[in-house]
Each structure stands twice: as structure tokens, then as C-alpha cells.
């Protein structure tokens, strides 16, 4: 099973996105996908959605990391699992940038998604319940793809 972590991004959103799409980490950006935004302008698109919704909380985005055991998944399978996780958790209602990093001993996904829902204008509620839902969906996708039941 993959390990998942999530934390808020309260500043330097552009730097966080630049880090996750770094070509040295993502096989020259082959392993980068976006939803309702473009990787170069995602930070401004996130802020535009936020402004349009009239939201002024401190959290700009959420950074979700999904790490796989060494050798457990190919970069392509890991990336596909990340896309499916986004679909299950974010339901096409949040802009996101997904990248799969292959530069470490283990493959891992970085998902940065807007804290503001494009449909409702409400902020993502990050709490134990939402984290357990992320974990549940990630574990389910790993099982569906015949990945290990061990954790990183």
C-alpha cells in the first residue's frame, strides 16, 4: 500500500508547483498531469478561482503525497493511480497538478490541488475524516492494481 500525507500550502504556491514539476524528478515532465489548469500558470489560476469565490482564508492549496514501496509500481502505474485518486477524492471539482517523481529510491506522487472548490466556492475541509477517505481510496486503488499490502 502507498503511504499518504497531506499538508496545507499557505505561501509560495508557485515555488511548490515548480518543485513538483521539475523535469529531473518527473522524467522530463512526461509524468505530469493537470486538471482545469496549466502547470506553468496553475498558481495564478488557483488564485483566480479563490478570488472569484470571495475566499480569503490562509490556505492557498493542499499538497498530497502518495509514496509507493521501492519496486512496487512502475512510474506509469503510479501516475495512473494518482490520477484515479484525484478523480475519486476531488471529483473534478478542484484544479490540480499531479506529478510522479522517480528521482528517489521509491516512486511517489505529488498532488497540489486548489483549496477552493471550483463548483461550490467552498474550501476543502482537511480533517481526520477527509484524510481517512484519502487513505481508503488510495489503499483501494493499490489493491485494484495488485500492489503490496505492506506500507512504506
Which residues make up each language-model segment?
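N-terminal nicking endonuclease/strand-transfer module with a His-rich metal-binding environment
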Residues: 1-152
Amino acid at each position: 500500500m502507498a503511504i499518504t500525507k497531506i499538508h496545507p500550502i499557505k505561501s509560495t504556491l508557485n515555488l511548490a508547483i515548480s518543485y513538483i514539476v521539475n523535469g529531473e524528478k518527473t522524467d522530463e515532465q512526461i509524468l505530469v498531469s493537470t486538471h482545469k489548469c496549466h502547470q506553468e500558470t496553475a498558481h495564478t489560476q488557483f488564485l483566480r478561482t479563490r478570488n472569484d469565490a470571495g475566499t480569503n482564508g490562509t490556505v492557498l492549496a493542499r499538497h498530497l503525497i502518495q509514496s509507493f514501496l521501492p519496486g512496487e509500481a512502475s512510474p506509469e502505474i503510479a501516475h495512473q493511480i494518482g490520477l484515479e485518486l484525484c478523480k475519486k477524492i476531488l471529483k473534478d471539482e478542484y484544479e490540480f497538478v499531479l506529478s510522479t517523481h522517480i528521482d528517489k529510491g521509491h516512486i511517489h506522487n505529488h498532488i497540489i490541488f486548489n483549496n477552493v472548490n471550483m463548483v461550490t466556492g467552498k474550501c476543502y475541509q482537511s480533517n481526520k475524516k477527509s484524510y481517512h477517505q484519502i487513505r481508503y481510496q488510495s489503499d483501494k486503488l493499490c489493491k485494484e492494481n495488485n500492489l503490496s499490502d505492506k506500507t512504506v
